[in-house]
């Protein structure tokens, strides 16, 4: 996971330099599943939620955000001209059949009330149908771009 993060970091910096976008920054969340173990890496305010079929929220990443005078600013991001702190948080968890993993940008969780987000994640539907519901809710309630990946563990 560390090697994948380092590779992505170096590639993003190379592209930003070649495009004269040295003032850019981004957030990142990723998951790698091997057997019944998931490794989550994240930095910034993109999130990972893991819900257990019978137990509710098992895990949620903690945003790297400062709130100053009502404004949110990233305290850490994946690469940025402002900060050398690009070390992601990494955690490993055991998965069970029925668990659901959502990787998403802030446009998702800022557009959908948390309990509705969790309820929809656990709907007895195909992942693409759940993501269509998220798409509808973000179009209706959101004002940011949004991206999501939903994995259902069998």
Regions found by a protein language model. Give the residues of each.
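PP2C/PPM-type serine/threonine phosphatase catalytic domain
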Residues: 1-154
């Amino acid at each position: 996971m560390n090697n994948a993060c380092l590779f992505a970091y170096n590639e993003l910096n190379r592209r930003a330099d070649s495009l004269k976008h040295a003032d850019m920054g981004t957030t990142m969340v990723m998951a790698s599943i091997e057997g019944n173990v998931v490794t989550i890496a994240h930095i910034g305010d993109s999130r990972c939620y893991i819900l257990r079929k019978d137990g509710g929220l098992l895990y949620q990443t903690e945003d790297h955000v400062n709130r100053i005078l009502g404004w949110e600013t990233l305290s850490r991001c994946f690469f940025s001209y402002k900060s050398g702190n690009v070390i992601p948080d990494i955690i490993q968890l055991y998965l069970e059949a029925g668990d659901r993993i959502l990787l998403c940008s802030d446009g998702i969780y800022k557009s959908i009330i948390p309990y509705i987000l969790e309820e929809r994640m656990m709907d007895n539907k195909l992942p693409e149908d759940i993501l269509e519901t998220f798409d509808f809710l973000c179009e209706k309630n959101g004002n940011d771009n949004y991206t999501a990946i939903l994995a259902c563990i069998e």
